[in-house]
């Protein structure tokens, strides 16, 4: 994991490869592939994200497109709204706000591995813009709820938040521009 952390820090998410990680760790690339199906899983392990990104995206994108925003939020809260998840959110946000390399890694990961995949699956126009809008909403939620602890948002039950947040995410991801 130290070699992977070093590669992500030096090259960002986009510039890091599984072969580069293997080289830095002085192991055969097949060993890395044995434990991780892709770069997204290595990054999730390095950042201690308690879920597999591909599984999250599959769960979010399966089902009726009209429920996309709600499924995104339910998935988000199931991963992050636990004591362990909150600690990891705070660590992620800290890395984003304290260094450009941390910000670049998180930005590239969120846009490429989560939100761009969601937008691509639903086949909408301007998928990159939509992905970044959805990511901005979710990063803002993470910051306000877990880091700043803005009340009553910080202590609200997720079920009370979903009806307010889901329509905005739905419009960002799948709604009309008009």
Q: What are the roles of these predicted feature ranges?
A:
Residues 76, 89-96, 134-138, 142:
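Short alpha-helical scaffolding segments that buttress acidic/His motifs in well-ordered protein cores
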Residues 3-41, 45:
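Helix-turn-helix
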Residues 80-103, 107-108:
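Amphipathic alpha-helical segments used for helix-helix packing
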